[in-house]
Amino acid sequence: MSIDGNFYPLGSCTMKYNPKRNERLAGLPGVAGLHPYQDESTLQGMLAILFELQGMLAEIAGLDAVSLQPAAGAQGELTALLCAAAYFRDKGEKRTKVLIPDSAHGTNPASANLAGFQAVTIRSNGQGLVDLDDFRAHLDDEAAVFMITNPNTIGLFDPQIGQIAELLHERGALLYLDGANMNAILGQVRPGDMGVDLMHYNPHKTFSGPHGGGGPGAGPIAVRAHLEPYLPAPMVRQNADGTYGLDHDRPRSIGRVRAFFGNVGVLFRAYCYIRSQGPDGLKAVSDHAVLNANYLMALVRHAYPVPYGDRCMHEFVASARSLARDRGVRAMDIGKRLIDYNYHAPTVYFPLVVSEAMMFEPTETESRDTLEAFAEALLAIAAEDPETVKSAPLTTPVSRPDEVLAAKQPVLKWTPDEAVQPAAQERQPVASGQASFI
């Protein structure tokens, strides 16, 4: 199943179509043939593109400076938090905590811990948004950063973000935006205008870079001016004579986080995407992403209840809890059965605040026909014999391997005697609860 010809509804992954124009441009000899050890004088074209990309990402974010070095969203989180730590260290403030909503991506607490902070969970309220009372209770002089994803992983925009930013800034803390869901707000609102101090982008999501093989990705970070001195060195700069170079003279920088200039291939594709869309095109991206998600949600929510919100942003989270209770069919089973209908499964069992969660993100590049056909498959599965669904997939050579064992003891080579396996062995179902993700 290729992203070029199939629908990937993976929530929080933004599996949009990857324009082939960008691939052709990235393959041009003047791009693909570059080497980072070349003299700067021979890299002027690419350095100009990277410099311009820094400016475009800063403008989209409504912030002042951008580093392109981080190689993935999670590394962007870590880099931004290291910059925040350096900022507070220079101020002589001992801040030890990073506040994180319970609906956050798992990389958020991991990044906080790696940066030397204690991750403190802030619970959600009954509407799936940040519980302001719990937030206030944990916001003290030891709090350094609040990491928010907005829209959040439930697919809801939190209108409290301005108030959250004000409360943070009153205590001298910073507001961080996990930019994983920027596809929902491109051209609609700038994070900086919401009070965000620092954030990361996922160009391989928002700006259409290919996800193939789990990477490569990129995780540029954007910051306000008072955090700019701490960005990784070197930065791409424009010299007084109009040429471009690398600025290594950054005494307060946290240092390198990635060799050379970052993952330039992904960054170049993001540049091509932004230039081809333009401001109006980027706004249309988010318009259609939100429209598609709401249309799909309306088609299926009577069979798969959506616990939070009447409308969503770019994605929504449905629950298979009632199917699990009444028919023994869990989110995992539904995801497996979709394979028989030639669809990739959605993200399941995330976010953790929804029982039997199924997260759907159709993106802006899917047609109405595709959404309706996918909804028909979901509705058919909801009405099927439970035993059929629980034994799926039925059309694949291997049905349900032990996914936990595969992760813990991966077999990374093939031998001829493994070529033929008895069907009975191939179709051993995984025990209930043994694996959480497809």
Task: Spell out what each predicted region is.
Residues 45, 75-245, 328-329, 356:
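Conserved PLP-enzyme active-site core in the AAT-like
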Residues 1-65, 82, 189, 239-261, ...:
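Non-catalytic terminal extensions of PLP-dependent enzymes
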Residues 64-70, 97-100:
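A short, small-residue-rich loop immediately preceding and capping a beta-strand
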Residues 36-38, 68-70, 149:
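Cysteine-centered functional microenvironments
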Residues 71, 125, 149-151, 319-323, ...:
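Short strand-loop junctions, especially beta-strand C-caps/beta-turns
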Residues 67, 120-122, 346:
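General small-molecule cofactor/ligand-binding pocket signal
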